[in-house]
Amino acid sequence: MHVLPCKMKIHFVRLLTLALLCGPFLAAQSVDDTQLKQVIIFGRHGVRTPILPNTVAGPGLSLDAFSTLPFPAFPVSGVAVLTPNGGTNETILGGYFRLWLTKEGLLTGKDSDDDAFVYLRANGTPLIIGTAQAFASGLLPAATVIVNSYTPPASDPLFDPVDAGVAHLDYRMAVAAVNGRLGGTPQSLAVAYAPELTLTRSVLFNYPAGQTPVPETPTGKVDVTSIPIDVATGNTSLPVDLGGLADVAAAIDPFVMEYADGLPASEVGWGQLSAGGISQIFRLYDRLLDLEFRTPYLAGVQSSNVASHMVRTMVQAATGNAMTGALGNPSTKIVVLVASNTNIAGLAALFHLDWLLPGYQPDVAAPGGALVFELRQSMSTAEYIVRASYVSQTMDQLRNQTGLTLAAPPASAPVFIPGCSIRNATFDCPLADFVQVAKRAIAPQSADLLN
């Protein structure tokens, strides 16, 4: 009988053990036998008007103070208002989810029956409620879906936990946490993002990028790109005041909305910006959101409560037993939450989630885009798993109001959940492991069990 040398024996045993461990994984990777049991769609509001007015009669910030030429007008007046095209795009997206969820078996096509299994919640502003209603009209066009929301001035603890009194924000800690990410030298951001600031200035003051010498600031105008970037105490909307970076973000905010809303090319950055140019400039806006909402301390304060309710909702669906703090009831199959990009950024940071879609910078929460959490069950093992993805219309799909089908879907990317995702193409995460990841991530003092 041939006897293996000792070292070869050990190596053989290791290979055999590895094969046994990987066997189920490889099988699961090649055949997806899971069935969708519940989905949580956490989306951003649709395309809107800018957050600042073009002009103001008295004191106060206005967009035209930042630019040589007047900012273009949108088809609808007002600040932070859902545009008609924005609403249309939300209905298109809702229609796509209708197709997908019907294919997956969560919807039957009988809207009056399916309505009983849908829970929809929106932060209490006209922009966000309007987005939710438009999405619902695509998801269940023949039903009148109730949009759950808090009536202002009451704050929704899911989306505004600090204002609602659920979470406490230590502003000094927030300043320290952000300052720590910048090495105590926030003005270094101006050097790191010099190309973006240079492009921003050329667009706002209407001269070719790269022109030398650089023109002086027009009389009576504010050069937001020269305002010092600092870290100081902010408010509940922007917990940390980042000085010039916040001013730049406000000035460039209209550009992505101009493009996505379908304004003529001559009115998108006054004809100076393509989709690629907007994406480059928006690295400044994205950096602001990253510091304000993806900083770990801030994510824990601002997003622990919504995360707690979402996890409880999944557990309730998996067990079939009512659970305190869960959204909907044990039979709820579809949960739609609509808020802002700040909310999505915070939740993503809490779980260390990242994504990248064509035409966008990393981790961008695009207008109407959504983090999607699928609760699925293996038909062979009965195990529940969580599958995460990010879904969004591309900039051109938004601009052109492109119809969506299963054959021509929005852009999407699977999202890896650190701490529990396995090495398959969809980064599946066993529900039990996801619950443990959530327990480690959620700051219990910033979460409650109320709806």
Regions found by a protein language model. Name each.
Residues 2-3, 20-22, 249, 441:
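Compositionally biased non-globular segments, especially hydrophobic aliphatic-rich helices
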